[in-house]
Amino acid sequence: MDKEMKLLSRKLAKIRGWIQAAATLLTNIHIPNLFKGKIYQGNAKTVCVPGLNCYSCPAATGACPIGAFQAVVGSSKFKFSYYITGFFILLGVTLGRFICGFLCPFGWFQDLLHKIPGKKLSTAKLKPLRYLKYVILIVFVILLPMLVTNSIGMGDPFFCKYICPQGVLEGAIPLSIGNAAIRSALGKLFSFKCMILIAVIVLSILFYRPFCKWICPLGAIYSLFNKVSLLKITVDSSKCVGCGQCSKACKMDVDVCKTPDHPECIRCGACIKACPKDAICYRFMGKSCQKNDNR
């Protein structure tokens, strides 16, 4: 066993909440803009952030990768989609859904909501809903923006406009509070999006990360790389006693022993903390908590 990697894995899992808070702050560094009703439009907005974070948030540091991809996926004038595609591949191959578990502001928002005391419901019997996010990715993020473009050749961001609750939470609400013109322009679409946001909030209190599991197209993209990403979860078969504590602790409904690199795994580290034998740890670029890793 590599003791250093094992200790690092447990420490990383233990401080995940602090890392999520720091990532959210760095992703939304322009805090004063929240009170001005203005969107930051500096050079950093040409760079995408790793998690789901609305471009229209007054505090946003960079661009949302899903929003940016929709804008140019069907464009005949811009080649920015090659950058976005490369961005997805680079982060996916490097970290996989670790981004969902540690670096996504909306993922952290759902985690905080789920900590609210009350009855919690399992999503174990709702696994077929996992595939909905792939349908949303294909239809609302790729196909519709490719087919419907505006006069300057930019794709219409269907997911951002009609589905994404993050846009209301981070964009429309703070902008309307600080900007009377925007407030007066709000209409039925805003009301519809508010209903989606409220539904996600209620579901997040009852279920663990429903948006991540069933709706998020960014999570769908990163999930495609989970099996090949440099950062993985590894199980030491020589230490594992098959007690199943890791799978019981996994709120993403993953059988950790059988499929530690399952597409739904967000690398949150709950299984690492739950294992009574210290048989589970992170693996990066082949370095793990066991010398001969067969999983």
Say what each PLM segment does.
Residues 1-257, 263-295:
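Non-ligating segments of multi-cofactor redox enzymes
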